[in-house]
C-alpha cells in the first residue's frame, strides 16, 4: 500500500510516488491497478499519463462512488472491471476504468458527484467499454506504444487561475516570486477582459516578460480554446511565453 488518505489530499508528491512504484515494478508485471478516491482521480490519471508515456502495459485507476462497506456499492464491479481490463491482451496506457467505461487518463473528468456514472471522456472517444462483462475495444494500442517512457520530475509551482467577470488584474502580480507558471481558465474560446487595452492583458504581459509561462485554456468542457478567434485573445496569443 503506497498511501492511505482521502483523495482530496493527493498531490504532486503522491503522483511521483505512484509513478516511481510503477517504474520500479514495471518489468515484473503485465499491468497495474491503482485504487483511488474519485474526487481527484482525474488529476492523478492526467499526471500519470505524462509521467508514464507510451506504455504498452495498462496502468489502470479505479475507485467507487459508494464505500465498499455499503450494500449497493459500485466498488466491486469497478474493481472487477479494472482488473479485467488490466489483464486483457489489448489493454494499454494510463486509463480510468469506471462504471463500464475505459477512459484515457488525459481525457477523464469527474462530471457527477453522486451517480455511479461519475466520469466522462472529454472530446475524445472512450478507449473501451464493458457490456455484459465483455470488453468491447474502441481504440487500439497506438503503434508507438512499444516501450514506456518515464518522466517523473514535476514542478509544483504552477497556479491555476479561473477568470470570472469583474476579476481584478492585481491578483497576477501577487503570484510573482511564488509561482513559475500560470494556467488561465478563460471564457469561451479564450481571451482576456479588456483585450490589449485592459489591465488583465498588462498583468499577463508583465508576467511573461519576467520569464514566466502563461498557458491559456477554456472553462468550457468541450471543443477547446482558440485565442485567434476574437480580438480579446489575439493580442494575448502573440505574447512571448504564452501557450495554448
Predicted regions and their residues:
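Internal gly/pro-rich beta-alpha loop/helix module
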Residues: 61-131
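Accessory alpha-helical/coil subdomains and C-terminal extensions
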Residues: 104-189, 194-195
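C-terminal non-catalytic interaction/assembly regions of soluble proteins
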Residues: 189-244
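Short Gly/Thr/Asp-enriched flexible loops that form oxyanion-binding sites at enzyme active sites
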Residues: 37-57, 194-203
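Gly/Ser/Thr-rich loops at beta-strand to alpha-helix junctions
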Residues: 36-42, 101-103, 188-191, 222
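Short, acidic/small-residue loops that bind anionic groups at enzyme active sites
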Residues: 45-74, 83-89, 208-218
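ATP/NTP phosphate-donor binding region
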Residues: 1-24, 222
